[in-house]
From Swiss-Prot:
<dbReference type="InterPro" id="IPR033945">
    <property type="entry name" value="Cyt_c_oxase_su3_dom"/>
</dbReference>
<keyword id="KW-1133">Transmembrane helix</keyword>
<dbReference type="InterPro" id="IPR013833">
    <property type="entry name" value="Cyt_c_oxidase_su3_a-hlx"/>
</dbReference>
<keyword id="KW-1278">Translocase</keyword>
<feature type="transmembrane region" description="Helical">
    <location>
        <begin position="46"/>
        <end position="66"/>
    </location>
</feature>
<dbReference type="GO" id="GO:0004129">
    <property type="term" value="F:cytochrome-c oxidase activity"/>
</dbReference>
<keyword id="KW-0812">Transmembrane</keyword>
<dbReference type="InterPro" id="IPR035973">
    <property type="entry name" value="Cyt_c_oxidase_su3-like_sf"/>
</dbReference>
<dbReference type="InterPro" id="IPR024791">
    <property type="entry name" value="Cyt_c/ubiquinol_Oxase_su3"/>
</dbReference>
<keyword id="KW-0472">Membrane</keyword>
<protein>
    <recommendedName>
        <fullName>Probable cytochrome c oxidase subunit 3</fullName>
        <ecNumber>7.1.1.9</ecNumber>
    </recommendedName>
</protein>
<feature type="transmembrane region" description="Helical">
    <location>
        <begin position="212"/>
        <end position="232"/>
    </location>
</feature>
<dbReference type="Pfam" id="PF00510">
    <property type="entry name" value="COX3"/>
</dbReference>
<feature type="transmembrane region" description="Helical">
    <location>
        <begin position="21"/>
        <end position="41"/>
    </location>
</feature>
<feature type="transmembrane region" description="Helical">
    <location>
        <begin position="174"/>
        <end position="194"/>
    </location>
</feature>
<dbReference type="GO" id="GO:0005886">
    <property type="term" value="C:plasma membrane"/>
</dbReference>
<feature type="transmembrane region" description="Helical">
    <location>
        <begin position="256"/>
        <end position="276"/>
    </location>
</feature>
Length: 278
């Protein structure tokens, strides 16, 4: 990013991105993270150090990259109308890929539940016609899962409140609503961790357990990412970065999209994995 650039003198509305080290550095950081993750799963020597280095490297690269994007929008005013449109399309496509991810998890769950004979029948003991397997003690869907459903539905309401407050140029209500949404996200994650801790089955306890932890755990990771996203928006809102005109509030808009997506996915998980699956 060149601080001496003067985008006002451009003869077009598009953003020609300056050379950046973050894409390639993020790629190497992700490689380190994957190596660390595999090493941790297999118990290799120094696995925790490699995994920690990968997490820190990815976090630093993403922070630095997004910091530059924010500066390009606020300081350099590079986020013109065509650029904002392109960013919105990119975010929509990203959410579409996430839908495909969860679609695969649901397909695996339905394959196992509607026809409970696993492909790895010799490894995982699954009795035909019985779902969930008799060795699995499932969760009561109207205990912690129902509470978590109410938490996420309420958080969807508060993030919408924050959006409307921003549109009305009410910074105080916007910041308050974002703070409530963040607290609800943290509460959800805490309840999910409590549920996992007291679960009667492990990830390796068969096809039901692997499907359950993969789907709900992947969603839980998205809640954590979304909460971090909202925390960044909270501090930016307090600083007065978001407006209703000009460069607008793309960061907040994308965080709200992402959070609503997480809410909808949980409703499907609650309905099919917890209620139908039990």
């Amino acid at each position: 990013m060149n601080p001496n650039s003067h985008p006002i003198t451009k003869s077009h509305l598009f953003h020609i991105v300056d050379p950046s080290p973050w894409p390639v550095l993020t790629s190497f950081a992700l490689l380190l993270l994957v190596i660390g993750g595999v090493s941790f799963m297999h118990g290799y020597k120094f696995n925790i150090y490699i995994l920690s280095a990968g997490v820190i490297s990815v976090g630093y690269c993403l922070y630095s990259w997004w910091r530059d994007v924010v500066k390009e929008g606020i300081v350099e005013h590079q986020h013109t109308s065509p650029v904002r449109k392109g960013l919105q399309i990119g975010m929509a496509l990203f959410i579409l890929t996430e839908i495909v991810f969860f679609g695969v998890f649901f397909a695996s769950f339905f394959k196992s539940s509607l026809s409970p004979v696993g492909l790895l029948d010799g490894v995982w003991v699954v009795k035909q016609g019985i779902w969930p397997p008799p060795t699995i003690k499932t969760f009561d869907p109207f205990d912690i899962p129902f509470i978590n459903t109410l938490i996420l539905l309420l958080s969807g309401t508060t993030v919408t409140w924050a959006h409307y407050a921003l549109e009305e140029k009410n910074q105080k209500d916007c910041v308050t609503a974002l703070a409530l949404t963040i607290l609800l996200g943290i509460f959800f994650t805490t309840m999910q961790a409590y549920e996992y801790y007291h679960a009667a089955f492990k990830f390796t306890d068969g096809i039901y357990a692997s499907n359950f932890y993969l789907a709900t755990g992947f969603h839980g990771a998205h809640v954590i990412i979304g909460t971090i996203f909202l925390i960044v928006c909270y501090f930016r809102a307090k600083r007065g970065d978001f407006t209703t005109e000009g460069n607008g509030h793309l960061g907040f808009e994308f965080a709200a999209w992402y959070w609503h997506f997480v809410d909808v996915v949980w409703l499907f998980l609650f309905t099919f994995v917890y209620i139908f699956g039990s």
